[in-house]
Amino acid sequence: MKIMQLVAAAMAVSLLSVGPARAQFVVSDPATEAETLATALETAANLEQTITMVAMLTSAYGVTGLLTSLNQKNQYPSTRDLDTEMFSPRMPMSTTARAITTDTDRAVVGGDAEADLLRSQITGSANSAGIAADNLETMDKRLTANAETSTQLSRSRNIMQATVTNGLLLKQIHDAMIQNVQATSLLTMTTAQAGLHEAEEAAAQRKEHQKTAVIFGAVP
C-alpha cells in the first residue's frame, strides 16, 4: 500500500513537470511511459527503504535503548586537568570523592602547611577513587548494553537490522577496549600519585627540620 501511494505521488510530480500541452489531443509514448513508471517505482522503493531504516533506528523494535547510551561519558580527566584533579587538587570532583573527603575519620584540623598538604593528598586520592568508581559503573552499564545488543542481534528480522545492530556491538567492544587502556593508565597515575605523596611528606618534614635548625642556629 505504501509503495502504491509513493508511486502515485511520483507520477503526479512527473506529470506536473511536463508543462502545458501544445495540442488538443494526448500523445502517448509507451516507451517513455514505461521508463517513467520504472523510475517512479525505483524512487518509491528507495524512499521506502530509507523510511524503514530511519524507523528501525528510532522505533522500539529496532535497536532498543542502544542509541541513547551509545556515546557514554568519558570518566577520565583530560591531560590538562590531571594536575588539578589528582596531583594538586583543590576540591573533590565527583560524588564518590566528596563522600570520601567528608568522612569524619579523614577530617584535618588546622591551617598550617602540613594540614593543607594532608587535605590536598586526601582530595587527590579521593578523586582517583571516584574516577575508578565511575569507570566501574560505566563498565557495568556497558556489559548490560552488550547483552541487550547480542539479544537484539539474534532477533533481527532482516539483514539491514542485523548489520546496524552488529555495527553497534562492534563499537561497544571498541569503546570497552579504550576504557581498559584508560584504566591501566589510571593505575599508573595513582601509583605515581602515592609516590608523590611520600615525597611531599619528606619535603614537608625537611622544611620543619630547617625551621628548627634556624631557631637553634644550626642551619645545614
UniProtKB/Swiss-Prot annotation:
The keyword Signal applies. The keyword Signal applies. Belongs to the virb5 family. One of its GO terms (cellular component) is type IV secretion system complex. VirB proteins are suggested to act at the bacterial surface and there play an important role in directing T-DNA transfer to plant cells. This is Protein virB5. One of its GO terms (biological process) is protein secretion by the type IV secretion system. It comes from Agrobacterium fabrum (strain C58 / ATCC 33970) (Agrobacterium tumefaciens (strain C58)). Residues 1-23 form the signal peptide. Keywords: Crown gall tumor, Plasmid, Signal. The gene is virB5. It comes from the Bacteria.
